[in-house]
Swiss-Prot record:
Binds 1 zinc ion. This is Transcriptional repressor NrdR. InterPro entries: ATP-cone_dom, NrdR-like_N, RNR_NrdR-like. Negatively regulates transcription of bacterial ribonucleotide reductase nrd genes and operons by binding to NrdR-boxes. It comes from Pediococcus pentosaceus (strain ATCC 25745 / CCUG 21536 / LMG 10740 / 183-1w).
Length: 157
């Protein structure tokens, strides 16, 4: 593996362990030339999955695009990168477990929101406002009222 520090092609594996319930191998490597240590992740290459966007166009499923949306929604919130990456893993696993070659962006967005609402309600509202394209304050307030009703129901249980 090429060293990200000096560009040398030789490195050795210092530590290797499974993560993400065994679906990913995390490897700590050390450059044989400069001694720089870095981490790599190895996962099974998944079959192509196309996302059908709202306008009908299709693009390949992109984990990073989902992560960027979550990071943007969680800005200045108490969610760490590991929690957000775990969210993306859960969404991708759920999407791929459906066994379909295509999935709508709406379904992916709903999966993200279903996980995000339990982790951070403010980040959820931010994500939902972009994803659902709130047209005005009334739609925004309706979403907040729905969340408040769900909270009240949880408290009664």
């Amino acid at each position: 593996m090429k060293c990200p520090h000096c560009g040398n092609n030789g490195s050795r594996v210092v530590d290797s362990r499974p993560t993400d319930e065994g679906r990913v191998i995390r490897r700590r490597r050390e450059c044989e030339k400069c001694g720089f240590r870095f981490t790599t992740f190895e996962r099974v290459e998944a079959t192509p999955l196309l996302v059908i966007k709202k306008n009908g166009s299709r693009e390949e499923f992109d984990r990073d695009k989902i992560l960027k949306g979550i990071v943007r929604a969680a800005e200045k919130r108490p969610l760490n990168m590991e929690q957000m990456t775990d969210m993306v893993d859960k969404v991708e696993n759920k999407v791929r477990s459906l066994g379909e070659s295509e999935i709508s962006s709406q379904i992916i967005g709903e999966y993200v929101m279903n996980i995000l609402v339990d982790l951070d309600e403010i980040a959820y509202i931010r994500f939902a406002s972009v994803y659902r394209q709130f047209k005005d304050m009334h739609v925004f307030l309706d979403e907040l009222q729905d969340m408040m009703k769900k909270d009240e129901e949880k408290e009664k249980e």
